[in-house]
Amino acid sequence: MSSCGNELISIIVPVYNVEQYLKRCIDSIINQTYRNLEIILVDDGATDNSGKLCDELAKLDNRIKVYHKKNGGLSDARNYGVERATGDYIGFVDSDDYIDAEMYEKLYEAIKKEDADVAECNFRFIYSNRIANYTEDNYYLILNRDEYTKEYVNMNRVFGAAWTKLIRSSLAKEIKFPKGKLFEDGFYSLELMKKAQSFVIFDSPYYNYVMRENSITNSKFNEKNLDLIEIADDIYDYVVSRYPYLKKDVARRKMYSYFNILDAIIVSPDYNNKLYYNNIKVYFHKNFLQLLINNKISINRKIRLLIMLINKKMYKKILLKHHRNLMGK
């Protein structure tokens, strides 16, 4: 089935040093069953052959527009693309990932049917040894802002990534990705959640998120990883102030973010800054009782918290084993 909707969808693809993955990504966009696309490739100062490959791909399909710019990071490249987008709707695809052929047709059908500001699908993690859907739930939900916030906080069916979404262009152009932030999607999703009025989300995993060991979000720890704590704190403060009945839920989400950073510090072989590690442990010590009695937090997670506070060496051993299994080593 092919779709030739009258409305134009602009797809923003930031490109930086991904020459071995880029063609697979762009082929998956070119082959979308929704044909009325504007494919914007933003070469963010790539130092490999990615920029040249963008130009070659543009010769094969007149829907592709290529822009070359100085390196400014992922957020800057996305903002650059959004500013130049002429579509009625805007979507994002990362250049080392790829999408199923029906993704934008189905997102467009949903956003039009429900007259929503944002449509969002499920996605898959693509590991070297396995494939896993973000959620196995079956759902098709039409949500207002308050209902979507609850889903976002609970992380059951809403991940918070830009690349699972189709967004009204007028809305997408109001929001900027924060330049220089590592977990830019979190900051962006929070602003989107504040501004959008209506959402439709469904369970089909059309986006394929490739877990590369040397990707930005899966590399050795550096201080930029602490951006995750900043956005976790921002989400917590916003939700508690506006939706106090979700305090336990958002406290759980905040705890997960702190755990993620603590784990990244522990598994990184070349990171010895004890200040950040100790600061994060202070958070867990300070909030230990509230986390322990929080009925939104699983028993397994509470056991993990106890092991981490009592025996760091044992916790690290368990964590490293889990990390190796996850990455297929």
Segments predicted by a language model, with ranges:
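Donor-binding/catalytic cores of nucleotide-activated saccharide
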Residues: 74, 95-200, 210-223
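Membrane-interface aromatic/basic loop that binds lipid-linked glycans or pyrophosphate carriers
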Residues: 269-329
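A conserved acidic beta->alpha catalytic loop
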Residues: 28, 35, 43-53, 70
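N-proximal low-complexity "stem/linker" segments adjacent to membrane-targeting elements
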Residues: 1-30
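Catalytic core of nucleotide-sugar-dependent glycosyltransferases
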Residues: 206-212, 218-246, 260-289
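Acidic helix N-cap motif at the loop->helix transition within catalytic regions
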Residues: 23, 37, 48-57, 98, ...
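Short aromatic/hydrophobic "clamp" motif used to bind/position activated sugar donors
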Residues: 90
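Glycine-rich, basic loop-to-helix element that forms the pyrophosphate-binding segment
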Residues: 69-85
